[in-house]
Amino acid sequence: MAGPDRRILPEASPRRDRPPPAHATMLSRFFAPRPRRFLLSQLLAGEPGLAGAFTWRTNRLPAALPDPLWLHFGCGENVLDGFVNLDFLPHDARVAQWDLLDPWPAPWPRPASGAFSEDTLEHFFLAEQLYILCELNAALAPGAVARTLMPSYARLVEYCRGFAPRPGEFLHATFGVETEADAVNAGMRFSGHRWLHDDASLARLARLAGFEAVKTSCAESTVAFLSNRNLRAEEGSAAFAHDLVKRVAIVRTTLAPGEIRGIEVVETVGEAIAFGEVREAGARVSWRLPHPVPAGEIACVNARGANLSAFREHSLKRLVFRGPWGEGAWALDETLKSKACMNLAMPAALALACGGADRVVEEIALEPGRSGDRVTIGPLEIFAYAR
């Protein structure tokens, strides 16, 4: 082929370039740019809202607190005078930001005289509700009342029995439901509803958190200051109301991880949140309790830590409880949590995992995922009854 053609079609001409020396190849590999390592700090800086699903930050009370101290949780736009109004998405300068699943202050500046919430607790799963009530117990003075209004499961089922669509009916007009079962499902889930109660189930939940549930009307509380604060009434809604009276004090203990096994920690961000990658099968984060505790004396356990890699598996984590009797595990369901870093166990889970409520727990561990998974690691929160 002639010279001009070689310039136009160089690929048609055989290459006569010398191969690079062996040492040059080695050096190019050594100095070649490596893929950037994913860091949680970068996600926090660039997308703090997304990173917040895997991290946490201790809630902060306003600097100036009224005396007496009355708390209003999940206030939305219903700002109440005489209360410290708290909401995860403040719409008003009078409202302080508060994520009910982030750690609460400890100790509190002073015990709260009481609390009020309406249409709030049902937006969390059952174990999360227990966590919230345990934190609330620790914030309240002895005998104080946490007033709670929410939709009643029993009243919802009764309303939906024999459901048939009709003009102007809320569930049909808003969600297009046309059958009884669909109406019940819509009522339990719309607007972020996650777990409804009847009188019996709420009383049990309250008892686990050290409260006695006293049924009231939606308007009248056993505490005058908490009466007539309601937005909804029994007429025209499924609402029901209870005063949760603090009967047994609950104490929260927070422990830093004692051992991190099979996980390469890459960095630490925020409030001592470790971020790393699982390197071995059977990786664990362990917390040694200050002293042995019978499983039946523990109201709630939360091992903080999220898995950022596995979104299709719902049972990849386990809580492991150890004592002189041996070891028992409780599988965690990722679909039953509002926030990825919450790894909760209720009293029934503790008793089942340990083989009895009388068995003593000395150590708790979290198995956070499989090899290659990126995870956050935080403290263990134990809520125990102050007998």
Task: Give names to the regions the model predicted.
Residues 285-314, 319, 342-346, 350, ...:
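Extra-cytoplasmic beta-strand recognition segments
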Residues 128-131, 135-141, 145-245:
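S-adenosyl-L-methionine-dependent methyltransferase catalytic module, highlighting the catalytic core
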Residues 298, 350-367:
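Noncatalytic modules at the cell exterior or secretory-pathway interfaces
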Residues 324-357:
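Extracellular carbohydrate recognition and processing domains
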Residues 1-66:
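Membrane-proximal basic amphipathic "stem/tether" segments
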Residues 248-292, 311-314, 325-326, 331, ...:
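Glycan-recognition and processing domains
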Residues 66-158, 242-247:
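Conserved SAM-binding loop
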